[in-house]
Structures are given as C-alpha cells and as structure tokens.
Amino acid sequence: MMNRLLVFLMLGAAFMLVVSANDAYGDEPAFKDLNQGDESLGKRKSCCPCWLRGNCFWGQNCYPEGCSGPKV
C-alpha cells in the first residue's frame, strides 16, 4: 500500500515540475500580470501548449511556443 502511495506522489510531483517548467518558459509574464488591463496579455491567458496535442481545456487555443506563439 505504501509503495502505491509513494508512486502516486512521485507522479504528482513530476507532473507539477513539468507544469511549472512550462510556466517559466521564455519571457512569459507571471499569472498575476495576465489579470491586469492589457488586452494582449488577457488573450494570452486562454491558451495552452501544443504538446498537449490540441487537447486544450475550457476552449483554450493551442500555441506551438507557449502563449506567445502563433495560434494553431
């Protein structure tokens, strides 16, 4: 039982590392900056990386290079 729990926790930690590494990619602004009045930043909030193979959630758009790349 402990082995399964440990594997589950390690997979969760690996997933969080991937997500945080993707958030830190390039010169992307912090999430709190996306909620401010700049319209271009607001549009970038609803996007997802294309390594999800287009399986974006909540109607997001897929961008090849983070949120700043051209929409796919």
Curated annotation (Swiss-Prot):
InterPro entries: Neurotoxin_3_Anemonia, Neurotoxin_3_sf. Keywords: Disulfide bond, Ion channel impairing toxin, Nematocyst, Neurotoxin, Secreted, Signal, Toxin, Voltage-gated sodium channel impairing toxin. It holds the Pfam family ATX_III. SUPFAM superfamilies: Neurotoxin III (ATX III). One of its GO terms (cellular component) is nematocyst. It comes from the Eukaryota. It is found in: Secreted; Nematocyst. Residues 1-21 form the signal peptide. GO terms for molecular function: sodium channel inhibitor activity; toxin activity. Residues 22-42 form a propeptide. Its main location: secreted. Disulfide bonds join C47-C62, C48-C56, C50-C67. The keyword Signal applies. Belongs to the sea anemone short toxin (type III) family. Voltage-gated sodium channel (Nav) inhibitor. 1 uM completely inhibits insect voltage-gated sodium channel inactivation (DmNav1 from D.melanogaster). This is Delta-actitoxin-Avd2b 1. It comes from Anemonia viridis (Snakelocks anemone).
